[in-house]
Amino acid sequence: MEVRGHADFAELGKDPVCAGASVLAMTAAQCVKSMEEAGRLRKKAHIVIRGGRVLVTAKPREEAFDEARLLFWTAETGMRLLSEAYPGHIKVKKEE
């Protein structure tokens, strides 16, 4: 999952669309980190949080696959809801 850029709904630091997207991305990152700490990933998670960009990748163990899928699906669903509520400010692209 990658979230980057600015929604340009309001000025930087006062943008509720960016705040919503940031909360979703940071929550996904924290959940993946928690999965890693619990030994539920096959290898170390890749989490980058820097300058308007959040990148989260994880390779779950077989028994944690559904948990990871639900985590990313939830974040994606939240992003899609933001995209519908604020068209033109959030783009959601899904890559397999």
Where are the regions a protein language model picked out?
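N-terminal intrinsically disordered, cationic/polar leader segments
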Residues: M1-P16, M26, Q30-E96
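Short, conserved glycine- and acidic-residue-centered signature motifs
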Residues: V17-A21
